[in-house]
């Protein structure tokens, strides 16, 4: 005699406890919620820190993005140049030539024009010119060119 009904073990395997996985029983307890929020906060903090570093410490132009220059990370250092370094920058007198008179030159810090015979400082890495007083004040707090942001720091190892 063969029975067509499943054995008791087989029926136990197929038996489903619906109320065991019901959504109404799903609860987030205090400790789990605390750890989930702490993990989310840590991930958010590191994401914002990475974004800040990429925006403020890495070069903005794609040309220098992969270049291995010692000036790449000097922009991250806070503070300006030493007074001796500021005094060592070259000073030139402004001379108007006829070709330059059509194109008005001005100091991008104070937006004032350069007058004939006025003293200007030239920043060596980029050759940008500024009024001596303007760029001296700038370089006391910053170590980069005000216009192109290239580092002005002199490498002490050379």
Swiss-Prot record:
EC assignment: 2.3.2.27
Name the UniProt record assigns to this protein: RING-H2 finger protein ATL66
Free-text note regarding domains: The RING-type zinc finger domain mediates binding to an E2 ubiquitin-conjugating enzyme.
Protein's UniProt keywords contain Transmembrane: yes
Pfam family, one: zf-RING_2
Enzyme class label: transferase
Organism name: Arabidopsis thaliana
Coarse class of the protein's main subcellular location: membrane
